[in-house]
Amino acid sequence: MGDSCKTILVLAITKWTGPIMGIVLLFTLFLIYPMFRMAPSMQASPNPSGEVFELQEEINDKFPNSIHFTPFLMESPNGDVLTPGVLSRFKQHLENLFEMDLNGDLAAGSLENQPYLVNYLDPDLGILMQAAHSILDPINSKLLDIGVTIEEASTEEIKLAVHRLISNPQTTGVLDFLSRHASYEPKDVNGEKILWWVSPATTFSIMTDNQKLGGGGLEIGVGGEPDVINKEHLNRRIKEVLIDDEGHYDLWGIAIDANLEAQDEGESSGVYIMATVICALLVIGFALKSYWATAICGIGLGILMIWLKGISALIGLKSGLVIDLIVPISMISLGADFAIHALRRYKEEKNNQYTPRIALTAAITGVLGALVLAMLTDSIAFLSNLSSSIEAVIHFGSAAAIAVFASFIILGIIAPMLLMKVDELADAARFRSTGKAHLATRITGSIGVAVASSTAIILMVAVSKLVGVITLGATTILFLCLPIAYLVAKQRIVEKSNSHQLLPDRCIDTNLLTIPAIEFLVIRSVRHPILVLGIAALITSISIFFAVKLEPVFDVKDFYDSESEMVIGLNQLDEHVGKSGGEPGVVYVRGDLVDPNALKAISNFIESLRNIDHIAETRSGRVTAGLNVVDVSRFITDSPFTIASIESNSGVQITDSDLDGIPDTRQQLEAGLRFAVEHGVLGAAGLQILMPDQIKQAIYLSEIGEHVTGIWFQIPGTRDQSVVTATEQSIKPALIDLEAHPSIYRVGLSGSPFTRKAQLSASTQTLYTSLPIALVAAVVLLSATMRSVRYATATVLPIVLVVAWLYAIMYAWGFALNFVTAMIGAISIGIGVDYSIHMTQRFREESRRVSDVIEAMKSTASGTGVALVGSAASSVIGFAILGFAPMPMFAAYGLLTAVMIFLALIASLVVLPCLLVVVADTPERRP
């Protein structure tokens, strides 16, 4: 920053403090309007661009889900769900569910009060499932053949019904409802030899009308739109009705409320986030020994949130977990850093017996350059995320840059200005806060304002913006305006008394923190720079070796409390389904699908899936999930009623001479598929076994001959990302072979396992691209402003060390790269460069005063070094508390951020001083 420009800014800040603070206040009030009225309703997408997402979008568009499935796992405490007690109780709860639905009482969230449950004709079993896709209706149909109902049936009769279902090839698919631990033994029942099946658990799904719920495909993950949230409210409502209070069975939802669970855990983590802010503010107050510093910083952080949300709304940034929670939490550290450096420097100058206004002038003169550079480099670090292909990351970088600018204005400039005005009032009022009574008042007031402002912040960020703003306003009035009004009143009393009593000497804070210890650490380091830098280089080399081993991994337990029903339900699913089921993936196929040879190629591809280790084969022998074009073709050729209807409708006779389930000619196949899309498929006695809506979820017939189908399959163990990668690699050769068929135009892989893999890969790529961009941009900016490439490089180099150390620790502690941990890299650059800039700028300032680098570094350590320790302590203690939050995502973020800030402090106090004395522009180049 040029000296003339800097001088003008300093004079403006110190001369027009009142108008400047007034403008900031008016701007804050103005931002309240967009904060409420222009708040985004859309969430930033966590998905990058790419084929896997394009295919998923086309699949969702071409194959609209008519039914929303809510999956559950029911487990018997007695080890067998195939008993009268469990099944009759389950049926009773289902009947209660039906009754509530008819009355519109299942509606939850913002859903309209109307019936939602639907029936489903299972094409594999040929049985109509009434609202619940479960083993209950198949068992009930067999019991009716015997002449009893579930309520009347004995254990033997139920076991007989299960045996008949499983032993019949047409209904053996009921095995897929049972636990992988299900077993059987031969027994005689009513003179019939049967297999007596015992299953500790069963899976089932409740079916609702997806169109009434807003449509859309299956979405499991944080960041859902309002329709997804409403579905989750409905899922929870259904579970409440089906839970059995008498203990006949235990019920687990299977990922039925990902967003609501995240919201609940986020709210339960709110107290820890609030404690983080409280501790940060109290440490600031302790470090500066000032109630006013605590109050100004606490209220300043609250105003910072208004600026962040208001400006974000003005420029159209979307919301999301990261923008709404992670960015505000991160800004606690950066905001505290701006405040402590500005306020600490002001107190240093004031302790030199300057008047408050002169002290402010000296402080701003000394620290403004560093604050501006910190603001610019922080912004560059965060804006480097604009290189990402992920919308949520781009909006994160933009929001963080806004917050950095707001921190600079509010806590770096306005905070010391306001403290100066308070000190002027205190001097004019002859007010001195000495004695035990004043000390107790300061401590009580500091705790009160810390708690109140933290409450306002957490309310604005996570609960209610309106209540948060009101709370912040009340906090400002109670803890800032009223004390200032008291000083004004006292000043008027003093003026009326015309008192000319001399003021006592100003109290000098000689030990705000352990200054000798900080000086000792820094000076001992700079006396042996080569040794220190050599050790740092060795540690960094080892760290890089381990850091590059970090892999992108997703596991639900990294995001949700391990004791939550979300995690327990998935654990139960793994336990009872194992390798016979898993997360669905899909192969997208587009081509001339009315060519029988194309269907034969698809059929061969489906059979080849059995040879891939990571693809599940159900207990009934199916390797695909749901319908595809080959299934529809086989249902048509197996149905004489459908064949007759097609011939009557179109004049085309369906034949299948080789009995492969595929019509012999192109004309036959096209006629069959088009009939099925319009009318469905008929079974025995002309009863419909496939509805048109079901067909439309298996085949999309295009007027231009490019038809589409999806081949769904299941992948067990996708919580281990290496399984997804291995599956993708294993299936690729088969995909290439299928696409090589002349009638197949495009083949691709999609589904949630592969979209998540792409998300993780893009998050990692963002780290790899944004990090060098931020570092290079920081070096260029600092070189231009400092007019020294050496100083700029020395300032930025410790940040590289911090990132390497941090990710090596992550690897050692068992963390993995994901959306949240990847962002910590960007935050570490922002905080690390902050610390480095303040040390470098202060050292250069002191070097101009004294020629000896040791003395210059000693002054730097006693001034800026102390401020760095205060800033770091406030953040480390606060974020360490967040590390105890029940939600693992917040806990990991808090712990790793605390570690990162500590590493940044060490790098700034130990490594950076050694670099500075090596490159110092002084006659005595080395100590």
Report each predicted region and the residues it spans:
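Hydrophobic, glycine/alanine-rich multi-pass transmembrane helices and their short helix-loop junctions
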Residues: 34, 283, 372-415, 419-425, ...
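Membrane-water interface of transmembrane alpha-helices in multipass transporters/channels
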Residues: 42-47, 290-299, 314-331, 385-401, ...
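Pore- and gate-forming transmembrane helices of large, multi-pass membrane proteins
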Residues: 261, 265-271, 338, 351-388, ...
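Short helical (or helix-break) motifs at transmembrane helix termini and adjacent helical loops
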Residues: 330-351, 371, 377-380, 408-415, ...
